[in-house]
Amino acid sequence: MNNLFSSSWKRTGGGGGGDGDIESGGGVEMAPPPGAAAGASLDRFFEDVESIKDELRDLERIQRSLHDANEGGKSLHDAAAVRALRARMDADVAAAIKKAKVVKLRLESLDRANAANRSVPGCGPGSSTDRTRTSVVAGLRKKLRDSMESFSSLRARISSEYRETVARRYYTVTGEQPDEATLDNLAETGEGERFLQRAIAEQGRGEVLGVVAEIQERHGAVAELERSLLELHQVFNDMAVLVAAQGEQLDDIETHVGRARSFVDRGREQLVVARKHQKSTRKWTCIAIIILLVLILVVVLPIVLKFVNNNKSSSSSPAPATPSPPPPTA
């Protein structure tokens, strides 16, 4: 994928005889028309872009799956069910991290390919092809940034709702709302000595231990999920600076206007040069025609004059005298 753009494009005619027959096309190589290389590069470029879009859609699907799992986990009261939900969410986050890293590598590859493509004639910095490729890659990075923000808000929501769930479980067992210190202790460690001692004394060991096991399982799930989401967030943060820089570059209208003006000026200069070449070509064509006419006159005129002179000399020469017959004899 690193080499997205081919630097050569050849079309070899059919016919394996290689006899040099132009009509049959044997062994004849034809140069590509202007812009063929750029067109082929753009085709390959957009194929890679579609592949990256598929990966981004998978990230969105995983984000929705995590959101649904988090909503479903609010009604769970069994440690085993919470453990199964934790395994499912861990698998989703692991898949999201893997896909995010793949997208990151592919975007970096597109950046390198864009830099290499700027050396192709007609595809330099500021050209329409370069602007198209740069804006498309920047759009993909913005989509990835939006996905990052979705996962970040999901992580914050899971952490907040986890504290609410722990508070509800505490209230279910003790009949009292936990203070901030107790809630922080339960949310951060999954354990609470005061909670255990008081609850066991009031309601019995079995029921309380079940609730505590659920809280501990939820704590493990949230802690692991938060760690994985932070890792995913770091993958996105590695590209945040590039996204911001490219966004400013794309939004800088003045820069694009200046580039467009430079292309217009360059095109005007090329038109002036082409017009001069056209005038020069016409001038030399007229000179060549005049020289050719002079040569024709120099070569043909003596021949014509000689032919005319020969005709005149032949018409002016006297006819030979006819001898008179001899007199008759007697």
Swiss-Prot record:
Q: Tell me which stretches of the chain form a coiled coil.
A: none
Q: What does the subunit comment say? A: Interacts with SNAP32.
Matching Gene3D superfamilies, A to Z? 1.20.5.110, 1.20.58.70
Q: State the family it belongs to.
A: Belongs to the syntaxin family.
Domain t-SNARE coiled-coil homology: from-to ranges? 212-274
Cite the Pfam families for this sequence.
SNARE, Syntaxin
Q: Where is the composition biased (Gly residues)?
A: 12-28
Q: State the name under which the record lists this protein.
A: Syntaxin-121
One biological process term in Gene Ontology: vesicle docking
Q: What is the lineage of its organism?
A: Eukaryota, Viridiplantae, Streptophyta, Embryophyta, Tracheophyta
Function, please? Vesicle trafficking protein that functions in the secretory pathway. Involved in plant defense by mediating host resistance to the rice blast fungus Magnaporthe oryzae. The interaction with SNAP32 may contribute to host resistance to the rice blast fungus.
Major localization listed first in the record, in broad terms? membrane
Q: Which UniProt keywords apply?
A: Cell membrane, Membrane, Plant defense, Protein transport, Transmembrane, Transmembrane helix, Transport
Any one Gene Ontology MF annotation carried by this entry is: SNAP receptor activity
Where in the sequence does UniProt note compositional bias of the Polar residues kind?
A: 1-10
> Which body tissues produce this protein?
Expressed in roots, stems, leaf blades and leaf sheaths.
Classify the protein's membrane topology as the record does. Single-pass type IV membrane protein
Species, as recorded:
Oryza sativa subsp. japonica (Rice)
